[in-house]
Amino acid sequence: IVTTMLQQQVKDYLLRLIQEFFKKLQLLMEKGSKVNEAEKLSIINDCHAFFSNSFAVSDTDNTEIIIEKVKDKDLLDLYVKLLLTEFEVTSRNKEKLSIVLELIEYLQNTDATFSWERTILREDILRILDENNK
């Protein structure tokens, strides 16, 4: 029981930490200023560093490896959010978007809790990928 409580405390701490990154990024995105591009990239890099340091996730990992490394569904949801935000802000890398789609589908298939947000994200990603293929 003590181990489970400790694991939950660590998970809660990690969730709060990464959510703070996203709050900062959201504030910058709402401002919409090009002046903040460097700061947006810095926060995205901080988020990647967080996942790299906490779970050894690297930029070259495929979907299966990411799922192996980040076993918690809440943290996987946040990683999806990070990759999608990175796509929107910077790279427009379709390969990353495909990973996001695969992660969302994995979460939909393995998490008994229905997530409207995941459903909408999945539809948005499919639309973007379809537009890029035309």
Regions found by a protein language model. Give the residues of each.
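N-terminal alpha-helical interaction modules that lie
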Residues: V2-K73, R127-K134
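Aromatic-enriched hydrophobic runs in primary sequence
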Residues: K11, F21, I43-H48, L83-F87, ...
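Structural register within alpha-helical repeat arrays
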Residues: E20, K24-L27, N62, Y79-E86, ...
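Charged, low-complexity interaction regions
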Residues: K31-E37, V89-K94, F114
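Amphipathic protein-protein interaction modules
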Residues: E64-T110
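Amphipathic alpha-helical binding modules
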Residues: N93-K134
